[in-house]
C-alpha cells in the first residue's frame, strides 16, 4: 500500500482489517497541507514535526515493521512537502530513538520502523541521488 494521507480513518481501518497480510505501508507525507498530530496540534508538511506526527498516527494501527515514511526525492517531485534528506534522517531518528525531534515527540520509540521510500527514483536521480544515498546510509546505522 502507498496511500496518500488526507483521510486517516479510511486507510488505517483498511490497514487494520488486513493486519498481518500487509508487508509494508509507505504513507505519502507530502502534497497534503497541514494535518493534526495525536496531540491535537496541526503540523505543516515539509517539517520533521509533520513527518513524525503523521507516522506516529499510523503506528497506532500497524506494527513498526510494517511502516515506512514516503517523501519526495527532490523539490520538483511534489507540489509541497519536500524536505532535505537531513530532515528525513532526523524524522527517522525521532521515530526510532526519540532524538532529533522537533516540537512533536512520538508516543513511543519505534526501533523496528521499516524504513523510507522516495517519490521517485527518477526524481532522485535528477537530484544527484541525494535522497537514496543519504537516507540509505542513515538507515544502515540506525539501531535495530
Where are these regions (language model features)?
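Secreted glycan hydrolases and related glycan-binding modules that recognize and/or cleave
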Residues: 1-144
Amino acid at each position: 500500500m502507498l496511500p496518500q494521507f488526507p483521510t486517516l480513518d479510511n486507510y488505517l481501518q483498511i490497514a487494520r482489517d488486513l493486519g498481518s497480510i500487509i508487508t509494508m505501508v509507505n504513507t505519502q507525507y507530502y502534497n497534503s497541507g497541514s494535518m493534526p498530530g495525536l496531540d491535537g496540534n496541526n503540523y505543516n508538511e515539509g517539517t520533521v514535526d509533520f513527518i513524525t506526527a503523521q507516522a506516529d498516527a499510523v503506528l497506532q494501527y500497524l506494527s513498526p515493521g510494517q511502516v515506512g515514511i514516503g517523501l519526495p526525492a527532490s523539490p520538483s517531485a511534489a507540489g509541497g512537502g519536500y524536505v532535505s534528506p537531513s530532515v528525513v534522517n532526523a524524522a527517522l531518528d525521532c521515530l526510532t530513538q526519540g532524538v532529533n525531534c522537533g516540537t512533536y515527540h512520538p508516543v513511543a520509540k519505534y526501533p523496528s520502523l521499516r524504513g523510507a521510500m522516495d517519490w521517485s527514483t527518477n526524481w532522485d536521480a535528477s537530484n544527484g541521488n541525494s535522497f537514496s544515498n543519504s537516507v540509505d546510509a542513515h538507515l544502515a546505522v540506525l539501531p535495530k
